[in-house]
Amino acid sequence: MKFSNKIKISWHDTDAFRCVRPSKIVEYMQETANLQCVDSGLPLDDLRDEKGLAFILGAMSISIYKPLHAYEEVEVRTWCRETKSYIFNRYFDIVRGGEVIAEAASTWVLIDLDKKSMVRADNYDFFGGKFYYDEPVAADSVPKKVRIGKDAELNFVGERKIAYSDVDYNMHMNNTHYPDMVCDFLSELADEKNPCRVKELSLSFIKESHLGATLKVSRSEMDGDGNILVRTQNEEGETCLEAMICLEAL
């Protein structure tokens, strides 16, 4: 079965064209995952404070089949499969009126915060057997790994400083904020003459973006299929994020 969380969408979650922003969709999904941990008996704060461990997101792919709007009531669901490696695979969907209108797949690793090392996921059963649900998953249900080649034609479009409102207790940008940051550099999403929305979004998290860091943001031109590539790099020139966004007309 899937763990379920019912929500009513806030007006403040929507963009210039009255569609829910991708960052809010990711937030709905990840808050539902957090609630599953609470329901299973070990909130993420306790996992960190009592066991010195934290989940770190490696990659996430989201498909938004239809736009969401203010005050709609939806059901957000999440599930994961038991793992025999270092990787946790977690899945999500959002249901409106009995119809699945968004889906996502994500990969996570468990980190020992003191040792700064990965922990095998199958070494622990923190959640008393309640964490894993026997839900079928398609063989290809894995997040798309975004890898932008060195020969990709990207143009520098601006800088973004990581500030107070971006970070969580890990002191780096919370991963639910990345879609907003990426979309802030897509002028297409603010074109009143040609309204559009994000249909798909794939994020590969390569290096954390810490409080106070200034990221350089580069992007490609939109191709014929509506795809745009985005890369962020820190002051040392290290790549922090690579993303692919697909837009469609409204």
Specify the residue positions occupied by each region the protein language model found.
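HotDog/MaoC-like acyl-thioester-processing domains
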Residues: K2-N5, S63-P143, F205, S209-T214, ...
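Small beta-barrel nucleic-acid-binding modules, principally OB-folds
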Residues: L53-P67, C196-E208
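Hot-dog-fold acyl-thioester-processing enzymes
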Residues: M1-L57, A105, D112-R197
